[in-house]
Amino acid sequence: MSVEQHQQALLESYQGTNDPKVQESARTANEYTELLKSGQVSKDEYIQMMQDIIRVNNINRSVDNMQVLEHMNTAINGLINLASLV
């Protein structure tokens, strides 16, 4: 999948829920991706920041939002993998 496809998956993950934690995580991941694309953060900084989002998501995971958070974590992992290839 491309960066744009993973970003679209993030968009879908927070549009499909009213949970503010999910919405904030997805928006933050998208902002970090834009920072990487514009060269404002290094690949290593980006990967660390994205992994931090996953750690926070795992802490915040609730039964009601498990599927949404898992979908978001999959998209974030895809973005991390793409960044690692650059």
Task: Report each predicted region and the residues it spans.
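Cationic, hydrophobic amphipathic alpha-helical membrane-interacting segments
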Residues: M1-V86
